[in-house]
């Protein structure tokens, strides 16, 4: 199973990162004689522009040229952000629109991340694992191969305090919708976590757990294969 950054490494990364407040500015007006800073990305026509820049760079620019603008609309979706979203260019996985995957997360081959899922810094999505809609993998949460994390499920993150152990989900585990796996819990290979379960302690390999807090109710071998099947076709990419 892939392991990634330690809590201390993540804390150092966040501390050292240049904090960013990117904005997108839509402008109508007279742009004659305007000089744009090198840090600006500018698109548009003679009468209209779209500018991508940092909020701190926009302020002096506006003070210098604001009288020439007729209409202004500014979009800002973060403030002093330390962690950008992950560049997915070389990710060999299926990532659906609306998934939030932060830099320094690992997405292994053949994984699937569905709409609205959140993968935080230091988290690992194992080979062939599916993270369903609106599920959350907190910082350093780690899944093995061929895991299914159900819609709305939460694998708690541990960056603070740094001494805490991360959630570890071993291979071939099924986690039902809206289940919560608390910090430091390890779920053994082939286990099944029922929908809505609150998992506060380690789960043995091959066990089925349910309840709040959860307890072992039977063995996974007693569950019909059709109810725990991992479908390879859903992980297939273009040939």
Curated annotation (Swiss-Prot):
* EC code(s) of this entry: 2.3.1.89
Q: InterPro entries, per this entry?
A: DapH, DapH_N, Hexapep, Hexapep_transf_CS, Trans_hexapeptide_repeat, Trimer_LpxA-like_sf
- Among the record's GO biological process terms, what is one? diaminopimelate biosynthetic process
Pathway(s) the chain acts in: Amino-acid biosynthesis; L-lysine biosynthesis via DAP pathway; LL-2,6-diaminopimelate from (S)-tetrahydrodipicolinate (acetylase route): step 1/3
Q: Which UniProt keywords apply?
A: Acyltransferase, Amino-acid biosynthesis, Diaminopimelate biosynthesis, Lysine biosynthesis, Repeat, Transferase
Q: What class of enzyme is it?
A: transferase
Query: What catalytic activity does the UniProt entry give for this protein?
Result: (S)-2,3,4,5-tetrahydrodipicolinate + acetyl-CoA + H2O = L-2-acetamido-6-oxoheptanedioate + CoA
Keyword Transferase attributed: yes
- Please list the GO terms describing molecular function: tetrahydrodipicolinate N-acetyltransferase activity
NCBIfam families (UniProt xref) = DapD_Ac (TIGR03532)
Role noted for this protein? Catalyzes the transfer of an acetyl group from acetyl-CoA to tetrahydrodipicolinate.
Family membership, please give it.
Belongs to the transferase hexapeptide repeat family. DapH subfamily.
Give the protein name, as stated in the record.
Answer: 2,3,4,5-tetrahydropyridine-2,6-dicarboxylate N-acetyltransferase
Q: Specify the species.
A: Staphylococcus aureus (strain Newman)
Ranked from the top, the taxonomy reads: Bacteria, Bacillati, Bacillota, Bacilli, Bacillales
